Amino acid sequence: MAGRHTTVKKADVAVIDSNVFIIDLRYQGDRNFAVNSRFLKLVAARRCGVVSLVNLLEIVGILSFNLNERQLLEFYGYFPRRYNIEVVPSISLDAHLPELKIKDIMDVMTLKASFGDALTIASVASYIPHASYFVTWGKEHFSGKMNAEVVTPAEFLRR
């Protein structure tokens, strides 16, 4: 249902950080591109991938420097189908940003996290609390700050 906020409860879900998608979309020459691509294909085939709305908006913001308004809106709407993943809590353009308590974000920042990383961590904790994995190339930014196991795409593929 469009606009409906959801909380993911599946146990074997992989929450994917924005940097994984940015490598796929913009950095085909990156040394991790092949592994990154295999990871995204596996997650799509298993239908176990989730991205937080916060991360999707970060991706759109990065792409905004190279895409026009129409392209950005099309990308935003097409993103979940392109990667066969779910956007949580909602992808509706009429939805509100995830409701998060300032205290929860501050608690994460006291663990030495940037505001953007704290938003991601708090969003995952609130809306995807039973995620098994948080998959990122910036493992050092998230390890010890999430309930999910923090792994790189390469580590996920070895499981």
PLM region descriptions:
Residues M1-A11, I121-R159:
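Acidic, PIN/NYN-like endoribonuclease modules and their adjacent C-terminal/linker elements
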Residues M1-V51, S64-L73, G144:
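Short, well-structured N-terminal submotif of metal-dependent ribonuclease cores
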Residues V20, N55, L119-T120, E140-H141:
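Alpha-helix capping/helix-boundary segments
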Residues A45-R46, R82, H130:
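Structured helix-beta-strand junction loops
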Residues C48, N84-E86, E149:
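Conserved beta-strand segments of alpha/beta enzyme cores
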Residues I62-L93:
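Helix-adjacent hinge/juxtasegments
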Residues E86-K139:
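Active-site neighborhoods of divalent-metal-dependent phosphate/nucleic-acid chemistry enzymes
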